[in-house]
């Protein structure tokens, strides 16, 4: 995306920003987020259907944090994930990888995570 790395990192890691982009569809939202961005630190995002019919805490523990470069984490169910940031003078690339869970089809999971990334980009570019 056409934003400097520092701005992208802030939008990705700041709870006040996370609540604006962390949803996979328009009928869901994140009413609050907590983020202790350091190895051993915990993140929790409260994800809820806007109609109040369902909600859950999406959480994990940071395994490795290299500021402005890499975040590795373990989700509450033990799956691993990572986010890589790379930049040149005018743009920043964000790549998120995750271990799929076994309940839902991989394509459905990929589409959900991609929708969140798309919402992140839309929010960050405002």
Predicted region positions:
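Short, highly charged C-terminal tails/helix-capping segments
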Residues: 123-126
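Glycine-rich portal/gate segments that line the openings of hydrophobic small-molecule binding cavities
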Residues: 29-72
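Hydrophobic pocket/interface hotspot
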Residues: 8-9, 18, 43-45, 62, ...
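A short, structured loop/turn motif at beta-sheet edges
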Residues: 5-6, 37-38, 63-68, 84-93
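Beta-strand/loop substructures that line and gate deep hydrophobic ligand-binding cavities in soluble
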Residues: 70-115, 120
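Short structured motifs
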Residues: 28-31, 80-82
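Solvent-exposed residues in well-ordered beta-strands and their adjoining turns
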Residues: 1-4, 48, 65, 86, ...
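Hydrophobic ligand-binding cavity/cleft-lining segments
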Residues: 1-28
């Amino acid at each position: 995306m056409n934003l400097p790395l520092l701005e992208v990192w802030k939008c990705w890691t700041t709870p006040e920003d996370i609540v604006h982009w962390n949803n996979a569809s328009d009928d869901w939202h994140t009413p609050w987020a907590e983020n202790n961005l350091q190895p051993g630190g915990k993140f929790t995002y409260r994800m809820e259907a806007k109609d109040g019919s369902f909600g859950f805490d999406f959480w994990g523990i940071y395994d490795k944090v290299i500021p402005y470069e890499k975040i590795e984490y373990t989700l509450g169910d033990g799956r691993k994930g990572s986010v890589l940031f790379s930049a040149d003078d005018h743009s920043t690339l964000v790549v998120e990888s995750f271990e799929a869970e076994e309940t839902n089809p991989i394509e459905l999971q990929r589409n959900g995570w991609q929708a969140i990334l798309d919402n992140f980009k839309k929010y960050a570019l405002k």
